[in-house]
Amino acid sequence: MAKEITVLGSTGSIGRQTLEVVAAHPGRFRVAALVAARNDELLAAQVRRFRPRLAVLLDEERARVLAEMVSDPGIRILAGEEGLMAAACLEGVELVVAAMVGIRSLKAILAALEAGKDIALANKEVLVAAGQLVMDRARRLSRQIIPVDSEHSAIFQCLRQGGRVAEVIITASGGPLRQMPRAEMANVTPEQALNHPTWVMGPKITIDSATLMNKGLEVIEAKHLFNLDFDQIKVLIHPQSVVHALVRYSDGALFAQLGPADMRLPIQYALTWPERWDLDVQPLDLAALGHLEFALPDLERFPCLELALQAGRAGGTYPAVLSAADEVAVEYFLAGKITLTAISQVVGRVLDEHQPEPVPDLEGILAADAWARRRAGAVAEGLSF
């Protein structure tokens, strides 16, 4: 029987690649619901191809346009928060792919867990902001959170060995600015920062990769996903992006997961876990690679990583504020309003001004997120050209 899935964020990079994986295995998946923020044309094309029972656009005006484009009585069209929650809880769905950027889908993910769904999680901001809340809910309900990020999928696979974990190592390519002096980074254009050397990703995560903020967010995410102490998680720069993560056990044994830089691999593993299916990808040729490089990150050149590690270690509402402030700062950079180096200035200022809540509930997390967005916008305006 085909596995029914819902895709939250179907028009984004991960959502599109998820549907590529689904299309590569005809008859083995059934797309029950698709959710997008505002891309009505692409969502309409996806709806026509995969024929879900439900299609949702968060933008209510565009949802009306979508209804006219689809015009199929067998497909329900909904909008806004109501539609998002309906898609997350749709009856018969086994797995919800959470691939929307930011924490807008947090309530929907919690509702999906309550409705008995497993989650294939590609949204790191949700676990950064509310990791304890989400993981506690999943454990209480005996539901599975399966990571989609390549690094966390790699850790997930390396942890199948059993035994006490001494250390987890997350790798980073170093991004397009890996060898650029800090003084030159202020002149980097959005086009330069979006030119990632190994991965094809959405714009927000690509900029986070350029600043190494992404790696700091991944450390926080790993802490919650795998119930680790913060100091058990390390970061190494690995330009080839072949080794995605490593796990060192207490006996000194070190397990690594290697593979090509192709997001379809971790996406498919999340969709098919605990099974492993065939996938048409170019095999990794280690002999052709010849060598693999590893180095420690330079926290002075990449202060966003240091800010993320500090916020993660402090806990409480600091990670939620970090994530929200970064999202706003990245939007300003992509719009050409601030420099790349100003991203860390915005995030640092907002973190410094934050009055944390040590053990936040859902309302506390959402309030911290909203405050951080407002404050980051004000700080960014002050730094804008």
UniProtKB/Swiss-Prot annotation:
The keyword NADP applies. GO terms for biological process: isopentenyl diphosphate biosynthetic process, methylerythritol 4-phosphate pathway involved in terpenoid biosynthetic process. Pathway: Isoprenoid biosynthesis; isopentenyl diphosphate biosynthesis via DXP pathway; isopentenyl diphosphate from 1-deoxy-D-xylulose 5-phosphate: step 1/6. GO terms for molecular function: 1-deoxy-D-xylulose-5-phosphate reductoisomerase activity; manganese ion binding; NADPH binding. Its cofactor is Mg(2+); Mn(2+). InterPro entries: DXP_reductoisomerase (IPR003821), DXP_reductoisomerase_C (IPR013644), DXP_reductoisomerase_N (IPR013512), DXPR_C (IPR026877), DXPR_C_sf (IPR036169), NAD(P)-bd_dom_sf (IPR036291). Keywords: Isoprene biosynthesis, Manganese, Metal-binding, NADP, Oxidoreductase. NADPH binds at T11, G12, S13, I14, A37, R38, N39, N123, E125, G202. It is an enzyme of class 1 (oxidoreductase). Catalyzes the NADPH-dependent rearrangement and reduction of 1-deoxy-D-xylulose-5-phosphate (DXP) to 2-C-methyl-D-erythritol 4-phosphate (MEP). HAMAP family: DXP_reductoisom. Belongs to the DXR family. This is 1-deoxy-D-xylulose 5-phosphate reductoisomerase. It comes from Moorella thermoacetica (strain ATCC 39073 / JCM 9320).
